[in-house]
Amino acid sequence: MAEKPHMNLVVIGHVDHGKSTLVGHLLYRLGYIEEKKLKELEEQAKSRGKESFKFAWILDKMKEERERGITIDLTFMKFETKKYVFTIIDAPGHRDFVKNMITGASQADAAILVVSARKGEFEAGMSTEGQTREHLLLARTMGIEQIIVAVNKMDAPDVNYDQKRYEFVVSVLKKFMKGLGYQVDKIPFIPVSAWKGDNLIERSPNMPWYNGPTLVEALDQLQPPAKPVDKPLRIPVQNVYSIPGAGTVPVGRVETGVLRVGDKVVFMPPGVVGEVRSIEMHYQQLQQAEPGDNIGFAVRGVSKSDIKRGDVAGHLDKPPTVAEEFEARIFVIWHPSAITVGYTPVIHVHTASVSSRIIEIKAKLDPKTGQVVEQNPQFLKAGDAAIVRFKPVKPLVVEKFSEIPQLGRFAMRDMNRTVGIGIVTDVKPAKVDIKAK
């Protein structure tokens, strides 16, 4: 039996639109949660007056259980369909969700966007403050080409499986997504009830007017991601554990290249070198790991305090690039006034987040064509596109988008909001001493 290809899935959408309920119910329907466990959770939810949250509780309980032991990242959120093995990155519902959404999205092969069809809720998600808009923008920046849209809460009394409301929601989303450059004709918009289960796995008798795929069918229609095995090895570190018997175990997703047991790897920016003793994915030992694999790998010669989230592992002959400065094409999404030289947002790139100062605004661009419309403008405001130079305040690994896109796209955050998005066009490398032992 050939092994099923692996896909990383991120679930996005506005708060309370049903992300956790959708994932919890899907896992239950696919047989990943025992009836007994569900009953137990239902009782707990009822006793706290939160009966409608029972499926969401599945995720929260799993998260708590996960946080009690060292389960190497997100093992519980794994499920299989006929065609794929899916890992759900970052179960939704985080206070810090956008930050996680950025690092999570940078590792995702596809996304499910959950959108409530309810009047008021849908509109809130699409408002300028809305996370439906923000998450779609971020998914686009982070290079997620494949999206499935779940139009949720079709069972709500004020929606009542109404085809017209579904069509209205879809038309608004299509217009917005088209503006972001998505090929909307290739995107499934599935009317679902995460709570009742309509169109998750079986076709819903409540919506005979819909003849597209169910959620699970749409998941199986996704295209497998291309594996950039020929590029230099890059593994952005998500977490670092110290595990008895194994030693220091960084966890992350292989973005490019191949990691093998016995390889010497260097972690940048710190420049520490270690030897790979073992590689593990979903509790299974591997001899090698390829792009898309979420792994833990034990390294000899590196202590837990040497490395942290945001560092990047690579091979010694082609180490990850630490930027003294970098040039980028950015698009300003939101800012209360104007962005000038000296502005210092937090740059979220792969798993790193580092404040970086704008040291030059080289040119303002036409956002649609990319043509230069003004050299050395004094300031930038919302809606502007530009070429700027950044200087990271602390050491930071970035790569040219044209060479390693996974490490070359970023979001700019400030005041708890996404201020802009960008791609790295050039890097002035910093000198780093590699501390080979």
Curated annotation (Swiss-Prot):
* A GO MF label: GTPase activity
Q: Where in the cell is it found?
A: Cytoplasm
Q: Which reaction does it catalyse?
A: GTP + H2O = GDP + phosphate + H(+)
Report the enzyme's class at the first EC level.
hydrolase
UniProt KW keywords: Cytoplasm, Elongation factor, GTP-binding, Hydrolase, Magnesium, Metal-binding, Nucleotide-binding, Protein biosynthesis
**SUPFAM superfamilies for this protein:** EF-Tu/eEF-1alpha/eIF2-gamma C-terminal domain (SSF50465), P-loop containing nucleoside triphosphate hydrolases (SSF52540), Translation proteins (SSF50447)
Highest taxon of source: Archaea
Region named G4 = 152-155
Quote the cellular component terms of the Gene Ontology held in the record: cytoplasm
What's its EC?
3.6.5.3
Which residue ranges are recorded for the region named G3? 90-93
Q: Which residues form the tr-type G domain?
A: 4-229
Region called G2, residue ranges: 69-73
Q: Which CDD domains match?
A: EF1_alpha, EF1_alpha_II, EF1_alpha_III
Q: Which residues hold GTP?
A: 13-20, 90-94, 152-155
Q: Where is this region: G5?
A: 193-195
Any Pfam family = GTP-eEF1A_C
The positions annotated for binding Mg(2+) are S20
InterPro entries (UniProt xref)? EFTu-like_2 (IPR004161), G_TR_CS (IPR031157), GTP-eEF1A_C (IPR054696), P-loop_NTPase (IPR027417), Small_GTP-bd (IPR005225), T_Tr_GTP-bd_dom (IPR000795), TRAFAC_GTPase_members (IPR050100), Transl_B-barrel_sf (IPR009000)
Instruction: Locate the region G1.
Output: 13-20
What does the sequence similarity comment in the record state about its family? Answer: Belongs to the TRAFAC class translation factor GTPase superfamily. Classic translation factor GTPase family. EF-Tu/EF-1A subfamily.
The record describes the protein's role as: GTP hydrolase that promotes the GTP-dependent binding of aminoacyl-tRNA to the A-site of ribosomes during protein biosynthesis.
Which NCBIfam families does this entry report, sorted A to Z? EF-1_alpha (TIGR00483), PRK12317.1 (NF008969), small_GTP (TIGR00231)
Q: What is this protein called?
A: Elongation factor 1-alpha
